[in-house]
Amino acid sequence: MSGARAERFPGHRYPQVVPEPDEVRPGAPAPWAHLEASARRSIDVARVVRRLVERGRSLEAGLPPLSQELLALAREPGLTVRPSAVLVALLEVEGEAHVVLTRRSRALRHHRGEIALPGGRRDGDEDAVATALREANEEIGLDPAHVSPVGWLSPIASVASNSAIWPVVGTVAGQPRWRPQPGEVERVFSVALADLLADDAFVEERWRRATPRPGADDEGFFPIYFFRVPEDLIWGATARVLVELLSIATGVDGDASERLR
């Protein structure tokens, strides 16, 4: 593994360590790249919720189908896939939808120092919504009473932690005071969806490793998504969840799960 490299994204520095694959190819442009800049600005929370309903992703519509990647991971011999959930918490700040993110502690075993959505492993027989709300309360001090769960995004696989992750979208009332859990979360912050939709924010690479990854294409390549934000980098599973959220919010065809197929 290499350290943070300015040359990976020229002119952009970030504190995380991003692993080096055996082979890298350029990926596709952002699904929303063809949209006018005006269509990527002034996205409020109500618009995101409305789009979720239109795409059949409301809570009432039920869980979306499993991705081919997740099904492939579940078929791996001798591998136990751990069910998990994350909360895609949406705040409204001056009329703009923001998503709540965390920086994980550098002392953690998996995904140390990375930007993440609050969430974690399922406890007992609780469902994905209960898991996401509990984990957000434990990790960042978000009171479940201040969250209105409104929809689902596609469940995805985290190969690094052998997890099946169910993203739950929820709207947050007001401007909460965050309480990061020591030892798990270094800081809590939010990013405007409009900033993630900016022309220079998104990058896709296609990676190939010597050991085939479940869900890779016929040549062994799989997409890795990155969002460049000021002095930071969002990538991996979190970026994949955000790609689908932004695709739905902007009304474009295709989402993270479809791009994996």
Describe each model-derived feature in a short phrase.
Residues M1-A116, G120-E138, L142-W166, T171-Q175, ...:
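N-terminal leader/linker segments that precede catalytic domains of diphosphate-processing enzymes
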